[in-house]
Each structure stands twice: as structure tokens, then as C-alpha cells.
Amino acid sequence: MAKIQIKSEKLTPFGGIFSIMEQFDALLAQTIDSTLGLRCTMFGYQYSEILRSLMCVYLCGGSCIEDVTTHLMKHLSLHPTLRTCSADTILRAIEELTFKSITYKSASGKSYDFNTADKMNCLLVNALLATGQLKSGQEYDFDFDHQFIETEKYDAKPTYKKFLGYSPGVAVINDMIVGIENRDGNTNVRFNQKETLERIFKRLEASEIYISRARMDCGSCSEEIVDMVEAHCRHFYIRANRCSSFYDSMFALTGWKTVEINGIEFELNSILVEKWKGKPYRLVIQRQRRIDGDLDIWEGEYTYRCILTNDYKSSARDIVEFYNLRGGKERIFDDMNNGFGWNRLPKSFMAQNTVFLLMTALIRNFYKAIMQRLKTHEFGLHATSRIKTFVFKFISVPAKWIKTSRRHVLNIYSDNNAYANLFKTDFG
């Protein structure tokens, strides 16, 4: 049996987190405190310190806010200058930043709560500008979708997916979340979506961030939503919901072009349609022969999918391929659920949980900024690596803080010399 020696030195297994903490402080602390305001003048924690503490939970492999107190505090507090707050302080800060929900009534008289969390949404955009992930004056591609979050909180409502929860509308540019507005889980996806999108677009435009192309699913295919989206972007690409008036036109079409997209054979065509009176748009039609050979009562031997757009120049294939890229955004929701705490909401009410959703979205955006700056190949990582891989390959390294010649030095016990460069460059 091997001999064991117990050493009482203050070693930490999370040596990689300290350079990330310093980078967070350098890039975002001023932006966070200027946007949210100072939380205290003398004693206590600023919002930037609270958000940094929450970031450490997920970048050290934690799964809930309480992990910062129960598991991580003794390690994070080893940093000689940067303070880490407790889980209770984070939870109090969430309550302080909570924005009152707005209640809307539908035509049928039913009430639905929305939470816009304007200040936190502004911070989300400002943080992306501070890290350089978005630049003022440039145009970007924009995606919008609703994510159904399963939870049994006090005010959770039954969704059409047969579970209790919320259904926040989430706006994405590239791989970054740029806006979140939470809603009751039983809210129809089109209900007040125009107002939600308009607030998000105006928030981006106030920071001189403009939208070139917008992609959305059939939940956004209504006249008022399309009119508003068209006013804020160059081109839109929206999945058209099927209706009987389209079928007559589609069945009469000739000149279908056979193409192969991602190894699957489709036939493409496009026509001009007047879906709403006096408003003609291009309808790109994609059809695929049914594999089972069964005939559908409406569509016959094919399955039809349509994209409504105001792009009259791009080829049908280019439009279909561009729209299909929207499916990759589902990875973001999977990442948020499993890596950044969306599957473990901390509070009992929607308004407070909306603040948490936005906090963790900011942390994920920052994580993506780190992956862009980091020489990932030196640590066996990729720019698209999940947070779990990042924890194993970068964060989990033994380290010890020592003081020598009146300076604090971090000793990292690793044969990977790449760690030495983190504090020598603008990364650490």
C-alpha cells in the first residue's frame, strides 16, 4: 500500500480560474457598475463583484448558486485582491435588480405576465460592446426564438409542451445572446411578440448595432410582426405557416429544381404571394418526397416547407441553406440549460428568475469572449468547446498563491507552459 503524507499548504485545484477572474474585472467591471449603478459606497459588494462570483460558479463546474458558498469560497478567496461574495449576497442582488412584470390582457380577457428587465438587457448589450464581441456601426444576422424552461416555481404556468414553466423570448446574434424577455409559460408565442421584438431592436439600434438579416420560425409569421421586423432589418426570413390558399399555388408550380442539401435531396421553387392584402412577398418553397410512401390528405406524396422573405435576389438554395443555420442556435439553449444554470432557477417568481437568466447569459457571452482570446489549442480545447471540457482542461490545475519580494505570485503546478503566458499578456 502506498504511503500518504498530508500537506496543509493552501493549494487549490482551480488554479485556472484566477486569470479568468482578472480578465472579467478588466473587461466588464466598469461597464457593469456604470450600467447598474453603484450598489454601495464604502462597505459591501458591487454588482461587478457579485456577477464575477456567479461566473466562478459555472466556470468551476458548479451547478447552482449555493456552490459558491459550500464548495468554492475557500478556493476563490485565495486571490489576494479580488473578493468573492456568498450565495446569499448573489440572491439579494437578484432581488435588488428585479424589474416589475407587466400584465397584458388578450382579446379573450385572459391575463399574461411579461418581464422586460430593461436595465439588465441594456447591460447585456453594453457588455458585448465592452468585450469587442459586437461593434457599433456594424450589421449582424439576428435570430429570435422562444425557449420553454421547465420549472415548478410558484408562478410557473402550464406550457403547450405539457409541463409547468416559463417561455422567454431570446434574441441571438451569431453565438451571443443579446436580449431576453420572460413570459408566462401559457402565453401564445405570437401574443405581444411585436412589442418584445421592437424593444430588442430599439435597444440594439440605440447602441448603433444594426440588423442585416433576421431569421424566425412560424411563430413570428403574422402581419404586424412581419411589418415591424421589416422596418428594423434589410431582409427577413420567416418560416411561413401552411394554409390552404398556398397549396393551390404550390401544386400548380412547374420548374422545380432538384438540389442536395446536407446529403438530403430536395426540390426548390419560389413564387410571389400576397399573404396579406397589398403586401406581396417572396415565398421560397422546399419539398421532399415522403420516405414512407404514404399520401398526405393536403400535401400528397411530398412534405412542403415554406420561407417568407423580402429577399428577391438570393437563390432559393442560398435562402434555404441560410435559414437552416438557425437550427444551430438550439445549441445555445442546450448550453444554457446544462452549463449555465437555466435548469436550476434560484428564485420562486418569474421577475427574479428573469434577472438570473440575463446574468447567466452575460456570463456565457463572456465565456465565448474568453474562448476567442485564448489560444485554445495550447490547452487541448476548441473555440466551440463546452463549459465542462473547459473546466477539465483549463480550470482544473493545482495552484498556490505566495508572496515574495512584496509581490503576489501564483504558482501553477503543471507541465503546460501556456499557463505562464496568461498573466504576461492582456489576457490575464
PLM features: residue spans?
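An anionic, glycine-rich sequence signature occurring as long contiguous blocks
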Residues: 235-338, 424-428
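Short acidic (Asp/Glu) and glycine-rich catalytic loops that position anionic groups and cofactors
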Residues: 1, 31-34, 72, 298-303, ...
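Dynamic "connector" segments at or just before major functional cores
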Residues: 1-163, 169-186, 193-207, 396-428
